């Protein structure tokens, strides 16, 4: 396919890295020049151009601008009715983006994560998932959502990633101070968390780790008594309320 990217930020760059080896002709905008140059250096089928040339050379266009910049930038561009647009933006609805890219339709809003560069990542999709599935589904899991309300809820819940990473980093620091190989200690914890959650539903995993008096049960009960669950739900509610 002929793919174009308007706004070559971190997530859009990761997405293109994940599929650049599949034979697509990819044209990316000069925005975030370091990311664009890295793609062209690593993949001979990726080129850099100004925004309008990106459109002229593309049949599928990924729009990955900051929501506040999108109206100003997109209004200056001429889209074609035969193009398909995938928005990677939050803070601006697919309908609002479609008004800016007309006559090209927005077929989906897609929210990947940095791991999409290597595969094995979740990708949230609102709209028609077929095109996203065709491009990314071989290496990643596509989660198709019903409507904008579901997208908003998923956006809030995915913020769990940062606190979980913080907890793993803190535990790795604690462990690393007590063993000879601190990098190995962190690698162990990351592998432990990732593999355990990948292989079992979370509630089932909690029960499997609920041996009376065991290390896992004792630490979980300590964390729960400290208000971990209430703090998490309060934080999610605050995100949902726009805080």
What spans do the regions from the language model cover?
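Internal alpha-helical scaffold of NAD(P)-dependent oxidoreductase catalytic cores
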Residues: 42, 96-106, 121-199, 242
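Short, positively charged
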Residues: 19, 77, 113
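Rossmann-fold NAD(P) dinucleotide-binding segment
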Residues: 46, 50-101
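NAD(P)+-binding Rossmann beta1-loop-alpha1 motif at the extreme N-terminus of oxidoreductases
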Residues: 1-56, 173-177
């Amino acid at each position: 396919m002929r793919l174009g990217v308007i706004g070559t930020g971190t997530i859009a760059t990761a997405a293109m890295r994940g599929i650049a080896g599949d034979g697509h002709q990819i044209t990316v905008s000069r925005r975030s020049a370091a990311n664009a140059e890295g793609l062209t250096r690593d993949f001979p089928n990726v080129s850099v151009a100004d925004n309008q040339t990106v459109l002229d050379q593309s049949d599928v266009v990924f729009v990955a601008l900051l929501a506040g910049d999108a109206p100003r930038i997109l209004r200056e561009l001429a889209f074609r009715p035969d193009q398909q647009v995938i928005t990677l933006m939050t803070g601006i609805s697919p309908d609002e983006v479609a008004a800016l890219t007309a006559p090209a339709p927005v077929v989906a809003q897609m929210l990947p994560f940095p791991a999409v560069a290597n595969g094995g990542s979740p990708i949230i999709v609102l709209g028609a998932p077929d095109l996203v599935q065709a491009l990314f589904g071989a290496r990643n899991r596509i989660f198709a959502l019903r409507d904008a309300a579901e997208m908003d809820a998923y956006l809030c819940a995915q913020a769990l990633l940062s606190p979980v990473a913080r907890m793993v980093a803190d535990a790795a620091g604690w462990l690393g101070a007590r063993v000879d190989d601190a990098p190995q200690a962190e690698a162990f914890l990351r592998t432990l968390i990732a593999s355990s959650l990948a292989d079992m539903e979370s509630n089932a995993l909690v029960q499997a780790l609920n041996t009376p008096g065991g290390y896992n049960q004792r630490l979980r009960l300590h964390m729960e008594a400290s208000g971990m669950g209430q703090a998490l739900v309060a934080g999610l509610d605050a995100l949902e309320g726009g805080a």
